[in-house]
């Protein structure tokens, strides 16, 4: 009887072959242990128009992705894999990033990108692109420590090294003592007194004073500008502006030598050419009748006319 019952059950499995062909895998036997879900069953045919099935719980700890999810909409090109690194000299900004990369990248964290000069770029030979070492203004001098230092405004021109340490003087006219002799735009002029203006500082170099004298026996001197290293030079004649020339201390050049006259009161004297005492240094139209001294008054040579604009004082700073 028991054998007949087992045969009957076997016969039922034969009858189920047709059902299996029509409906796929038969339900598990009631006495058989349950099979792990989703591991040993054959996958059904994928229907692209069928609703998305509920994904089974993951068996392992891998990261799960939604099956067949459409790629996200992006305003910039979408890449399945990270974009290749940019070539040297060009930086690309892509609208996505690697999961292991911080955002924003460290070298673009503060403000927009500016292409530095090639001298401030270094490539270390890796595959991460260009490394930006520093971004500096080409317009400011940099020290090795990266600290900006102003140029040494007190540094003498090279040709005046022999005059270093000597006291400087200011030169002003009796017509306007608050205006000093200075250099501006390559010309000798008068400007409001400013002791901090190096161009208003002059050296009275008397190197050849014992060798060269004027017709009255007065010793010569040169007026050398501390800021430019230029000496005031004779003009081509009366009514013409004086000139400037690079001073060469070891060269005797009469065209840069001047003398002072006798004292006309309060220490004011005329300044005239060593080889022509008739022509005097003159603040052009600086006398009161002509309008007086102003900022930018031109310095010329003129015949003596007894004006205050022809009387000068050379006084230490």
Curated annotation (Swiss-Prot):
Subcellular location: Nucleus; Cytoplasm
Domains (record comment): The ricin B-type lectin domain binds glycan structures.
Oligomer and partners: Interacts (via N-terminus) with ATS3A and ATS3B.
Chief location: nucleus
Region Disordered, annotated ranges: 1-157
Span of domain Ricin B-type lectin: 168-315
InterPro entries, sorted: Ricin_B-like_lectin_EULS3-like, Ricin_B-like_lectins
SUPFAM superfamilies associated with the record: Ricin B-like lectins
Cellular component terms (Gene Ontology): cytoplasm; Golgi apparatus; nucleus
Residue ranges, compositional bias (Basic residues): 1-11
Annotated GO MF terms: carbohydrate binding
Leftover remarks: Plants silencing EULS3 exhibit an aberrant abscisic acid-induced stomatal closure.
Source lineage: Eukaryota, Viridiplantae, Streptophyta, Embryophyta, Tracheophyta
Name of the protein: Ricin B-like lectin EULS3
Biased composition (Polar residues): 136-146
Compositionally biased tracts (Pro residues): 25-36
Induction notes from the record: Induced by osmotic shock and salt stress. Induced by abscisic acid (ABA). Induced by methyl jasmonate. Induced by infection with the fungal pathogen B.cinerea and the bacterial pathogen P.synrigae pv. tomato.
Keywords: Cytoplasm, Lectin, Nucleus, Stress response
Main function: Lectin which binds carbohydrates in vitro. Interacts through its lectin domain with glycan structures containing one or more Lewis X, Lewis Y or lactosamine motifs. May play a role in abiotic stress responses. May play a role in abscisic acid-induced stomatal closure. May play a role in disease resistance against Pseudomonas syringae through its involvement in stomatal movement.
GO biological process: defense response to bacterium; stomatal closure
């Amino acid at each position: 009887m028991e054998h007949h019952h087992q045969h009957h059950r076997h016969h039922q499995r034969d009858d189920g072959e047709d059902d299996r062909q029509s409906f796929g895998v038969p339900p598990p036997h009631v006495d058989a242990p349950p099979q792990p879900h989703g591991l040993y069953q054959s996958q059904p045919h994928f229907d692209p128009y069928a609703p998305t099935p509920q994904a089974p719980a993951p068996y392992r700890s891998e990261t799960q992705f939604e099956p067949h999810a459409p790629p996200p909409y992006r305003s910039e090109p979408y890449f399945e894999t990270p974009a290749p690194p940019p070539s040297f000299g060009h930086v690309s900004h892509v609208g996505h990033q690697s999961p292991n990369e911080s955002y924003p990248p460290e070298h673009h964290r503060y403000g927009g990108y500016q292409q530095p000069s090639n001298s401030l770029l270094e490539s270390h030979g890796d595959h991460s692109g260009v490394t930006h070492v520093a971004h500096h203004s080409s317009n400011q001098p940099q020290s090795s420590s990266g600290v900006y230092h102003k140029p040494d405004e007190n540094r003498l021109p090279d040709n005046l090294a022999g005059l270093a340490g000597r006291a400087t003087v200011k030169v002003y006219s009796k017509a306007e003592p608050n205006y000093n002799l200075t250099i501006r735009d390559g010309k000798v002029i008068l400007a409001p007194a400013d002791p901090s203006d190096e161009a208003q500082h002059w050296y009275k170099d008397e190197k050849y004073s014992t060798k060269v004298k004027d017709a009255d026996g007065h010793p010569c001197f040169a007026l050398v500008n501390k800021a430019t290293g230029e000496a005031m030079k004779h003009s081509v004649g009366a009514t013409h502006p004086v000139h400037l020339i690079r001073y060469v201390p070891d060269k005797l050049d009469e065209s840069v030598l001047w003398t002072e006259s006798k004292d006309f009161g309060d220490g004011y004297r005329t300044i005239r050419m060593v080889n022509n005492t008739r022509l005097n240094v003159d603040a052009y139209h600086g006398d009161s009748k002509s309008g007086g001294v102003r900022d930018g008054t031109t310095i010329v040579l003129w015949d003596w006319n007894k004006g205050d604009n022809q009387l000068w004082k050379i006084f230490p700073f």
